[in-house]
């Protein structure tokens, strides 16, 4: 009798890399996961290798277990998802088990996500209507930095974003209110003020 292969996930997702003890992609010390695959192809992208969905390594149960284990360290304020594009449909499906497990295991830690897709127009206005995973994933994301990187609007003085068109959104307050109204002003790398 031959062995039956049972995949870890129904959807295959690659990741480009992991950055531990990251201080550039959200407040405090972060555990950052760079997923592979992005269809935006922004001019001036800092990570063009991640555009390919085949770049990097397969995201496995062992990868997920490692991330969850590492995030148990007290030094981490939270986890950040970026890439690549975490909100690409295949990546949403691949990330959902990880973020659910992360928030169930560490409810006191925050989850940031960077996406070139606009929260109100593309994520809620399109993906949420055709993919049940979108609303489920948003349930666990605390802060979303949205909008494509625009080279002509590049601003190195901005905290946690690359161009002035990008927005920092409190996802949970926005979902609760039913509209985008909870933008966050970042006054210091470790302090967030809701405005």
What are the residue ranges of the model-derived segments?
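Conserved Radical SAM active-site core
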Residues: 11-15, 29, 47-127, 132, ...
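An anion/phosphate-binding loop that grips the pyrophosphate of nucleotide cofactors and donors
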Residues: 141
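Conserved, mostly hydrophobic/aromatic
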Residues: 144
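A short, gly/pro- and small-residue-rich
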Residues: 155-176
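Single conserved hydrophobic/aromatic residue that forms the stacking wall/gate
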Residues: 184-195
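N-terminal [4Fe-4S]-dependent radical SAM core
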Residues: 5-34, 43, 47-54, 180
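A charged, well-structured terminal subsegment
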Residues: 147-157
């Amino acid at each position: 009798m031959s062995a039956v292969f049972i995949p870890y996930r129904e959807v295959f997702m690659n990741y480009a890399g992991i950055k531990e003890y990251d201080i550039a992609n959200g407040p405090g010390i972060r555990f950052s996961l760079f997923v592979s695959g992005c269809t935006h192809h922004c001019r001036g992208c800092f990570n063009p290798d991640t555009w390919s969905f085949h770049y990097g390594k397969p995201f496995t149960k062992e990868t997920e277990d490692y991330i969850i284990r590492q995030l148990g360290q007290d030094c981490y304020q939270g986890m950040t998802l970026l890439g690549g594009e975490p909100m690409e449909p295949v990546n949403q499906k691949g990330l959902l088990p990880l973020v659910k497990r992360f928030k169930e295991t560490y409810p006191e830690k925050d989850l940031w996500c960077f996406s070139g897709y606009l929260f109100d127009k593309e994520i809620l206005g399109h993906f949420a209507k055709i993919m049940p995973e979108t609303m489920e994933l948003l349930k666990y994301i605390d802060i979303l930095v949205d909008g494509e990187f625009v080279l002509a609007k590049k601003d190195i003085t901005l905290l946690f974003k690359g161009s002035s068109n990008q927005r920092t959104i409190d996802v949970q307050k926005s979902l609760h209110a039913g509209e985008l109204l909870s933008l966050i002003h970042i006054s210091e790398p470790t302090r967030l003020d809701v405005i």
